[in-house]
Amino acid sequence: MTIKTRFAPSPTGFLHVGGARTALYSWLYARANQGEFVLRIEDTDLERSTPEACAAILEGMEWLGLNWDEGPYYQTKRFDRYNEIIAQMLEQGTAYKCYCSRERIEAMREEQAAKGEQQKYDGCCRDKAPRDTDEPFVVRFKNPTEGSVVFDDHVRGRIEISNELLDDLIIARTDGTPTYNFCVVVDDWDMGITCVVRGEDHINNTPRQINILKALNAPVPEYAHVAMILGDDGAKLSKRHGAVGVMQYRDDGYLPEALLNYLVRLGWSHGDQEVFSIEEMKQYFKLDDINKAASAFNTEKLIWLNQHYMKELAPEYVAKHLEWHMQDQNIDTANGPALAEVVSALAERAKTLKELAASSRYFYEDFAEFDETAAKKHLRGVALEPLQLLQKKFAELSEWNVEAIHQAIEATAAELELGMGKVGMPLRVAVTGAGMSPAVDLTAFLVGKARCEQRISKAIEFVANRINS
């Protein structure tokens, strides 16, 4: 049997981290078992579903690299199929028309609540013959009244629910539109889904959906209900904890590999291993290893993983993601070093690509003024002679490379009988405008000869003015 899983978000908002983790687990289970992964958009909530939210979900999935083998399917394009099955169930007697008014249902619930009884439909229309009338009606599934629903959940183990606790679920509204729980069942059946991976908030739907599947003589898939994600303070995850759309993490400078690695460990483990490549995830992932307990979101851990991947992934690959941030920050990279070289130079010093982009601006643009603290410390009168000699030696270089630049700095220090720092730091501030950068010879190389000479001249003028003031 081919394993077939699905991710079925509702396009009523962004793809958040909880949904992304569910998608990842479902995708991994399919990939780990040479199976297929289906993307389905559950857009039956016509009032809340939006094209913008749908586009955001697809963009998030693509950015994460969670490719799908089928879809995206849209439930709103399958209404004819749902109505076909509803008609079939009415014909077979596994569903019925309910003419109870909203007022009657509300009164019934109030009475049940007053008696301390479970609030559920009392079956008033269950065994009545259909009426030849124009009265509005809903269609209800005729849930079994005896026995239990039993299923083995990959995460939670065996679950058993008495049918006495389940009421007759509405499967079509008064306007004829099918309901969520019914559409899901028909979709999973038609699409051949063998395992449903979803959040634990759906676990109460499962017995109802299983009963509908059995009434249709359809195969019942396996289930894995994943625990929720909490904030690091134990409260329900909210925006202040990091419950934002997946693309916000892109905007904030995270690599997809870092977010995927973080999400896979948010409830699943393989020994003590923390860092997983995508291939390792596919190799080791098992649904039965998912933790039952809720997991706490920890932004510091995500940052640590992002730093790891910024340093460990190929600079050329990281550069492709960095390019988006350069454009976002209006940094024109046409005249300057290759982005892969910038990644190699700066990745050790940045937590995010957003940070890396901001710190690389001096490679491509001239700065208006020197950092006040750095200039006060390193562009003093004693820096004038080293800068002037460096300017002369740089002008004489026939080749502009790291080794030649380093030799020029060493020669300047030796000639003036100064420590390397007394030469290197004024040079660093001169060419970057600040007191922090990668190795100064590498920095000067990446800035380029023409820009270096121009900026050293600017620094010399700055120091001279300072002496004369």
From Swiss-Prot:
It catalyses: tRNA(Glu) + L-glutamate + ATP = L-glutamyl-tRNA(Glu) + AMP + diphosphate. It is found in: Cytoplasm. InterPro entries: aa-tRNA-synth_I_cd-bd, aa-tRNA-synth_I_codon-bd_sub2, aa-tRNA-synth_I_CS, aa_tRNA-synth_I_cd-bd_sf, Glu-tRNA-ligase_bac/mito, Glu/Gln-tRNA-synth, Glu/Gln-tRNA-synth_Ib_cat-dom, GluQ/Sye. Zn(2+) binds at C98, C100, C125, D127. GO terms for biological process: glutamyl-tRNA aminoacylation. A motif ('HIGH' region) lies at residues 9-19. PROSITE patterns: AA_TRNA_LIGASE_I. ATP binds at K239. Its EC number is 6.1.1.17. One of its GO terms (molecular function) is glutamate-tRNA ligase activity. Monomer. Belongs to the class-I aminoacyl-tRNA synthetase family. Glutamate--tRNA ligase type 1 subfamily. This is Glutamate--tRNA ligase.
